[in-house]
Design a protein with these regions (language model features):
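Bacterial N-terminal signal peptides that target proteins for export
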Residues: 1-8
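Secretory/extracellular carbohydrate-interaction modules
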Residues: 22-98
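Short, aromatic/His-centered strand-loop micro-motif at the edge of beta-sheets
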Residues: 100-126, 146
Length: 179
């Protein structure tokens, strides 16, 4: 069985189960100091957005950290948002996963979640949203995931998810599952 057959089979199963599934592929090349949205989707019901990211090149400078960012937000300005990001230190340092949340543009949570050796720029991140308001997040390097964690009461309802890139060149393969 090929990967495309497996994906088609899984998509058919999810459709029968009342789950919508979609696959997206992005290539990005965002210069240092710039921030670009690669994808945005409204979030009806419960669902998840998961991405495998492959970084080819990082553009570094004094002020900005090169990163790919997943966001779960209530408003278009993303003043009420959870951001899950990953970046590396210059000169081959470890990969760090970082969580930040904002309510009315004020920072609420800002913490490093996990550090791991960088696996040639390949890593995974996911956010999930729930009708009860909770937001889940998960991350990993190469083929393994860390345990899913939650912000039970973020102070806002997720109305859309988005993917952003800043100071990086690479690709992302993403899957959206929604009920």
């Amino acid at each position: 069985m090929t990967l495309s057959h497996a994906v088609a089979g899984l998509s058919a199963f999810l459709l029968v189960a009342g789950v919508q599934a979609a696959e997206y592929h992005f290539s990005f090349d965002v210069p240092y100091g710039q921030y670009e949205r690669q994808f945005k989707m409204k979030t009806p019901g419960d669902g998840s957005l998961s991405c495998t990211v492959m970084i080819e090149k990082e553009y570094r400078g004094e002020k900005w950290v090169p990163a790919v960012i997943l966001a779960a937000a209530e408003d278009d300005a993303e003043d009420d948002t959870l951001f899950l990001s990953s970046s590396t230190e210059p000169n081959g340092g470890p990969r760090t996963f970082h969580l930040r949340t904002f309510n009315q543009a004020k920072p609420i949570i800002d913490k490093a979640l996990w550090e791991a050796p960088d696996e040639k720029g390949v890593y995974k991140m996911a956010v999930s949203w729930y009708a009860n308001g909770a937001i889940g997040y998960q991350y990993g390097v190469y083929a393994s995931w860390q345990e899913k964690q939650f912000v039970e009461k973020p102070g806002f309802a997720t109305r859309h998810v988005s993917i952003h890139a800043s100071g990086v060149k690479g690709t992302a393969f993403c899957y959206v599952h929604a009920k």
